[in-house]
Amino acid sequence: MGINEIIMYIMMFFMLIAAVDRILSQFGGSARFLGKFGKSIEGSGGQFEEGFMAMGALGLAMVGMTALAPVLAHVLGPVIIPVYEMLGANPSMFAGTLLACDMGGFFLAKELAGGDVAAWLYSGLILGSMMGPTIVFSIPVALGIIEPSDRRYLALGVLAGIVTIPIGCIAGGLVAMYSGVQINGQPVEFTFALILMNMIPVLIVAVLVALGLKFIPEKMINGFQIFAKFLVALITLGLAAAVVKFLLGWELIPGLDPIFMAPGDKPGEVMRAIEVIGSISCVLLGAYPMVLLLTRWFEKPLMSVGKVLNMNNIAAAGMVATLANNIPMFGMMKQMDTRGKGINCAFAVSAAFALGDHLGFAAANMNAMIFPMIVGKLIGGVTAIGVAMMLVPKEDASAAKTEAEAQS
């Protein structure tokens, strides 16, 4: 049994605990029947529900872009392919740079990869779980949640996180290379050359974004907002056209991928968008309760991390929440000290969703890549913390240290 299978078994263990809690909550609660242990698992049933309810949000984000992937590859290919080949990189890296893996990046990367499976997975699941989500999701969503006065720390954190994405990608690529990733029994050949050469365009984009956030942060952040709105419009167009094609047979946009199984698809080998979403939700049934219960059971060690980093307990809790979903963390930012704000935003760039949606997506689409993806995301997130700690202004760091000491 490999590490990827072990991770799945662990999540299914937590899924069963959460299912028990949901059942017992109908008859007075887990504590009533299971005593102290029941009290320790109460609330996991609610996370069980959250995992399944995520299906709707995932569908809105994924289905349209998944259907559009071959169309976008056909339209963008003549421009993207020559540029990336000139840089010595695979064109699939374009997809993971701008799109989250679960918002079309994985499928667009496959279309642009030209048959290079390693490059497709490197972009679609490793890069596409770090840079793409930051640009199309995290920044626009954060701007709608955080206080205007905290935009400074968002920009600082994203800057720190962006520059360490290549470190996380290389780490994930090396784990994939040495763990012997296979698809349908066939080995996927990750090489040093592939891992390093494909980082060239990523480094260029990372440097440009970092410079923009350093010198024109407001304009850069507004630019991300505009791009995100355009992307939502495009995804909605793709979803509407795909549904019309499925229900009425009208091909409003030629070349769309089917969103349900089509004639010739082999069950278990080919999964279309709707089935992928269902598979992700099944994984999230265990992933969300796992994060809740691990946070509860190991609260003291986790809070001690906050003291080591000289930030308050709210900031430490935000980092843990980020591993499942960064939206709660952004909601907590107003209660964090300034050092914690910068560190949390930096950590979220790579590490967000590592034990949530991205884990579910990898498990549903390519479970051999679960461990490489998680390692890459966590290393990218941890190194981003180090950079953020250097970027936090000295006066903010001193204030944070004083506040952390007062809480201890």
What are these regions (language model features)?
Residues P70-V75, A109-D116, L174-S179, W250:
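Transmembrane alpha-helix boundary signature
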Residues L87-I167, N312-M366:
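Alpha-helical membrane segments and immediately flanking helix-loop junctions
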